[in-house]
Design a protein with these regions (language model features):
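N-terminal targeting sequences that direct proteins away from the cytosol to non-cytosolic compartments
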Residues: 5-59, 67, 130-132, 139-162
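A short, sequence-level motif marking secondary-structure junctions
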Residues: 48, 74-79, 126-130
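Generic recognition of long tandem-repeat/solenoid scaffolds
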Residues: 59-64, 107-111
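A short acidic-to-branched-hydrophobic micro-motif
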Residues: 61-84
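Solvent-exposed loop/turn segments at secondary-structure junctions
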Residues: 68, 76-79, 115-116, 141-144
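Residue-level recognition of conserved beta-strand positions in structured domain cores
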Residues: 73, 137-138
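Signature of long, low-cysteine stretches enriched in small and polar/charged residues
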Residues: 87-133, 139
Length: 162
């Protein structure tokens, strides 16, 4: 009996030492988030701004005699940072009007700043669909405001997502 005990004791001690096979299931694989596709911007630009002066993957610049129009798409996230990028001012120092249109939040604001040739006026709109900030900025000299024949209200009202 003692011999049997001493023979079974090492087997019992080594019984829990077997290597286990690691199993993986589909639930163990992390799923990477996919970015939503960018939507198209629709805007009715003045006739003299029909052709962009500069173009990149994220936007277009239209330079005209008395004003500039900048249309760009930025990644959504920090709205305050987008406002600061467009205007140079913090959101707290501007009056930002928020409305909702076409499944996106719309933010409109204006500002004045010193430019190379005097005071410049700026107006911007941001459409935030949760994935991207679609923006349009118009910059013009304060002196040229009286001379500009463009009806800016129509341009800004036409800015939308398709």
């Amino acid at each position: 009996m003692k011999k049997l005990f001493w023979m079974l004791l090492p087997l019992l001690l080594l019984a829990g030492c077997a290597a286990r096979e690691t199993m993986e299931t589909l639930g163990d694989i992390p799923v990477e988030g996919t970015a939503a596709p960018q939507r198209q911007i629709s805007v009715k630009l003045p006739d003299e701004a029909a052709v962009p002066t500069a173009e990149s993957d994220s936007g277009r610049i239209y330079l005209c005699k008395d004003y500039e129009i900048i249309i760009q798409t930025l990644e959504a996230g920090d709205l305050d940072e987008t406002i600061r990028t467009l205007s140079g001012y913090d959101r707290d120092s501007l009056t930002v009007m928020k409305t909702r249109a076409e499944g996106a939040d719309r933010y409109d604001f204006v500002w004045a700043a010193a430019g190379e040739n005097g005071e410049r006026l700026g107006r911007a709109v941001i459409l935030d669909d949760g994935n991207y900030h679609y923006t349009m900025t118009v910059l013009k000299d304060a002196e040229a405001t009286k001379k500009t024949q463009v009806v800016w209200r129509t341009v800004f009202e036409s800015f939308s997502l398709v």
